[in-house]
């Protein structure tokens, strides 16, 4: 398990290092001569993450980021297994306590499943800040980590009509948003608003195509998964395994790691570039 000190040292080392010699000067310098990066994230703390996603990741020699809300039933029932998952090198990320969301998504579609008590329309920035801060303490008790990342619930970034992105900035190394796209301009990326693709009921070929796009553009592809082989907003286990197999086969050119590890490198490179200007 990586400590906060190790991560901060990683940031310092990455900032001091120059771009890989194999990379063109205009390309973002990924570690080990890789030409792109991929992050695999899993939302909502589900049983299928413990039963399917994590074992399949480990079989492929990969690690993922699991965004667990405090009210997750799986977390309550299987807490020792979630602690063990973190001990095996996976990241536990903050997904608030009560998974608050807006009533309507960006497309104007209603989310009738959101309880009235947890509508972001009725939250204040202070309330979401304090809820997320409390969840950080819960996660600290689980894995001992001080450096944390966040995933905006439902990819929503406002509380009571006011953006809460900047209010969370002091609490996190980085935060995952939505937009169903990759980050092609990594140097100009806001670490607190990293785009991701919410993959739902798609096959392995389409999942791999998203990773290939990152490779073609030298960018960062963040996958946003929910259920794996079951539960809600699912992707089949077979499709998930096909993606993992492709990533394992292409590990020399595509760096796949946790959101925390990848964003520690991105932030370090951004700081190094700013210091040179």
Task: Indicate residue ranges for each PLM-predicted region.
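Bacterial N-terminal signal peptides
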Residues: 5-16
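Boundary at the C-terminal end of the N-terminal hydrophobic targeting segment
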Residues: 16-24
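Boundary/entry segment of secreted carbohydrate-active catalytic domains
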Residues: 23-51, 196-197
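C-terminal domain-boundary segment and adjacent tail
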Residues: 24-32, 64, 74, 140, ...
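Metal-dependent polysaccharide deacetylase catalytic core of the NodB/CE4 family, i.e.
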Residues: 36-38, 58-162, 170, 179-193, ...
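Active-site metal-binding loops of divalent metal-dependent hydrolases
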Residues: 42-45, 96, 227, 259
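Solvent-exposed, polar/charged alpha-helical surfaces in well-ordered, non-transmembrane soluble domains
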Residues: 51, 55, 83, 126, ...
């Amino acid at each position: 398990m990586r400590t906060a000190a190790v991560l901060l040292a990683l940031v310092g080392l990455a900032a001091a290092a120059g771009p890989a010699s194999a990379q063109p000067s205009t390309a973002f310098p990924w570690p080990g001569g890789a030409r792109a990066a991929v992050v695999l994230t899993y939302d909502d703390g589900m049983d299928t993450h413990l039963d399917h996603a994590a074992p399949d990741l480990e079989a492929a020699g990969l690690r993922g980021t699991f965004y667990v809300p405090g009210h997750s039933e799986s977390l309550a029932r299987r807490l020792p297994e979630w602690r063990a998952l973190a001990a095996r090198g996976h990241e536990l990320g903050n997904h608030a306590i009560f998974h608050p969301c807006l009533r309507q998504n960006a497309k104007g579609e209603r989310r009738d499943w959101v309880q009235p008590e947890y509508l972001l329309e009725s939250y204040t920035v202070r309330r979401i800040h304090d809820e997320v801060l409390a969840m950080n303490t819960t996660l600290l008790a689980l894995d001992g980590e001080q450096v944390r990342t966040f995933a905006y619930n439902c990819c929503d970034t406002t509380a009571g009509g006011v953006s809460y992105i900047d209010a969370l900035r002091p609490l996190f190394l980085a935060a995952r948003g939505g937009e169903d796209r990759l980050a092609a301009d990594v140097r100009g990326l806001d670490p607190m608003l990293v785009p991701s693709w919410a993959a739902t009921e798609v096959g392995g070929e389409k999942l791999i195509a998203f990773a290939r796009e990152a490779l073609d553009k030298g960018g960062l592809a963040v996958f946003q998964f929910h259920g794996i082989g079951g539960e809600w907003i699912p992707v089949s286990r077979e499709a998930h395994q096909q993606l993992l197999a492709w990533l394992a086969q292409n590990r020399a050119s595509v760096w796949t790691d946790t959101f925390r590890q990848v964003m520690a490198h991105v932030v370090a490179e951004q700081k190094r570039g700013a210091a040179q200007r």
